Amino acid sequence: MAEVPELASEMMAYYSSNEDDLFFEVDGPKQMKCSFQDLDLCPLDGGIQLQISHEHYNKGFRQAVSVVVAMEKLRKMLVPCPQTFQDNDLSTLIPFIFEEEPVFLDTCNNDACVHDAPVRSLHCTLRDAQLKSLVMSGPYELKALHLQGQDVEQQVVFSMSFVQGEESNDKVPVALGLKAKNLYLSCVLKDDKPTLQLESVDPKNYPKKKMEKRFVFNKIEINNKLECESAQFPNWYISTSQAENMPVFLGGTRGGQDITDFTMQFVSS
C-alpha cells in the first residue's frame, strides 16, 4: 500500500516568512497581514484562516489534508459575527420571535357598562308642606296623612338611589324605592293621563345605575323644599292633596291647590 508522503517543502511553501504571520487559506497560499492573536469568526466571503504551530511541522500530509477538508466544511456552516448588538436591532428580531395577532377590544355598550356601575343610595322620609307623612295604603298605594306619637313609625322609608339621567345644576335624577320592599315609584300613562304607581321589581336587578325612565324623578331643591318631577313626563310632579288621607298622585301643576313641596329627613341605615 502506498504511503502518503510527509509534508515537507510543499507545505512550507505556504508559510509566511514572518513568524508572527503563519497563516494559510484553503483557497491557496497567501501571506496574511492580520494577527491571529485577536481571532474572531470571519465573514463567509473572507475565507478561513488557520494558525500553524512551529511544534507540529512534522505532522503528516494526511492530517494536513484532513484539517483542510474539515475547515472547508466548517466554512459552509459558519455565519458572520454580528456587530455589537444595538437597541434598534431588537426591532428586527421581534417579528421573528413573536407572531403578530390582531387585538380586538371587546367594548361593552353604554347600557351594560352603566348597569355594572355602583349605585349610591340613601334612606329618607318625605313629608309634604302641611307636614303630612306618606304611608302604605294597600299593597300598591301611598297615602298622605298626619301622624302623631307612635304612629310616626308607620311612615314609609324611601331608598333614594342616584341614577343616570339628564342632570343639571338644579335637577338631580333619582329613583325612589321603598326600603326593605321590592317596590319603586314609577310613572306610566293610564287612560291618556300620567299616573303615579308602585311597581314591583326583581331585587336581583334593582336598583341599577341606568333605571328605566319611568322610575326616574328629577329631584329639585329650592329653599330647603324638595320637588320630584317625573323624567318620563316633564312638568308632572309627585303631589298630595290638601285633604287628609288621600292617595299620593302625579300632578301637573305647581303652586296651586295640589301640594308638590316636600321636606326630606335622612334616616340612618
From Swiss-Prot:
Give the record's GO CC terms: cytosol; extracellular space; lysosome
Additional info? IL1B production occurs in 2 steps, each being controlled by different stimuli. First, inflammatory signals, such as LPS, stimulate the synthesis and promote the accumulation of cytosolic stores of pro-IL1B (priming). Then additional signals are required for inflammasome assembly, leading to CASP1 activation, pro-IL1B processing and eventually secretion of the active cytokine. IL1B processing and secretion are temporarily associated.
Q: For site (Important for interaction with integrin), what residue positions does UniProt give?
A: 171, 179, 181, 190, 204
Q: Per its record, how is this protein called by name?
A: Interleukin-1 beta
Q: Where in the cell is it found?
A: Cytoplasm, Cytosol; Secreted; Lysosome; Secreted, Extracellular exosome
Q: Does Chaperone show up as a keyword for this record?
A: no
One GO BP on record is: positive regulation of immature T cell proliferation in thymus
Quote the function comment for this protein.
Answer: Potent pro-inflammatory cytokine. Initially discovered as the major endogenous pyrogen, induces prostaglandin synthesis, neutrophil influx and activation, T-cell activation and cytokine production, B-cell activation and antibody production, and fibroblast proliferation and collagen production. Promotes Th17 differentiation of T-cells. Synergizes with IL12/interleukin-12 to induce IFNG synthesis from T-helper 1 (Th1) cells. Plays a role in angiogenesis by inducing VEGF production synergistically with TNF and IL6.
